[in-house]
C-alpha cells in the first residue's frame, strides 16, 4: 500500500532557488516586479508572519500601547505592502541589502534559512531566520520570519 503525503517534496537545489528568489524580492526596486514575484512565490491566501526585534516586542507589551508583538500580512496585497515598506525603509533609505547565509535546510514541506541585512561596507546590520511552509504546488503558504539579531 502506498502512503500519500500532504506535503510537497522539493530538492535541495529547488529549496536554494526558492530562498534566493525570496531574498531577491526584498531587494527588488521595481514595485511591479515585486508584485509578480509575490504571485510566483506565495499562494494567493499566503501569510507572512513577522516577529520583530525584542525592542519592538517590549514596547508593544507595555500597558496602554495599542500594538501587536506579531505582525501578519495575508494575501498578495498585504504581502506586497509589507515588501514595499521594507524595501523603501531598509534598502532605499538605509542602503541595506538582504542576503542568505549558507545554512539552508529543508524538511518535508518546510524550508529554513538565515538571512542578513548588510550595509554597503559589508557590516551586518541584522540577522533573521525564516521558515517557509510550502503548499502542495510548491508556493509559500506560511512564511514565519524571526529577526534574531
Could you say what each language-model-derived stretch is?
Residues 1-149:
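C-terminal and inter-domain tail/linker signature
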Amino acid at each position: 500500500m502506498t502512503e500519500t503525503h500532504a506535503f510537497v517534496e522539493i530538492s535541495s537545489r529547488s529549496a536554494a532557488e526558492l530562498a534566493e528568489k525570496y531574498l531577491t524580492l526584498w531587494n527588488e526596486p521595481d514595485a511591479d516586479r515585486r508584485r509578480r514575484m509575490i504571485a510566483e512565490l506565495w499562494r494567493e491566501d499566503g501569510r507572512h508572519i513577522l516577529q520583530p526585534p525584542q525592542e519592538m516586542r517590549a514596547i508593544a507589551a507595555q500597558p496602554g500601547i495599542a500594538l501587536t508583538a506579531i505582525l501578519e500580512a495575508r494575501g498578495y496585497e498585504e504581502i506586497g505592502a509589507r515588501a514595499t515598506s521594507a524595501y523603501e525603509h531598509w534598502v532605499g533609505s538605509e542602503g541595506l541589502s538582504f542576503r542568505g547565509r549558507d545554512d539552508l535546510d529543508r524538511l518535508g514541506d518546510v524550508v529554513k534559512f538565515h538571512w542578513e541585512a548588510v550595509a554597503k561596507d559589508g557590516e551586518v546590520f541584522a540577522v533573521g531566520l525564516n521558515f517557509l511552509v510550502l503548499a502542495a504546488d510548491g508556493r509559500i503558504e506560511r512564511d514565519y520570519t524571526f529577526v534574531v539579531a
